[in-house]
């Protein structure tokens, strides 16, 4: 079994990953962690350096999660894409044909990490567009079953 997990290192993603492994871990599935860095729209040099720093921290966090899963005995593949998360994940689903795609539902609670804080500020402005937009888009278009994990408000 191959499970593709859309991972953004948020509190909800970590919780959903744990729950997914609780549900499917005994099957020893291949876990494909797909993480997407959204490209910065601001082209100033300070913004670029902040973006690159945040991207590096995000990439490191994703790889550390993959390493931890590997230590638990799971076969892991990591894909780190850049761009529109919906399109990057959909293309990966179409190319890799996983048995299941897992997504953590977006939270209204701000996340503590750098990426989460940056994204949270933008999301509030475009909440009508972004609330569930990735989940909704992939649930309609993915060529495999999609599991959208609900997460508690407080862990």
Regions found by a protein language model. Give the residues of each.
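Structural beta-alpha unit
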Residues: 70-112, 120, 155
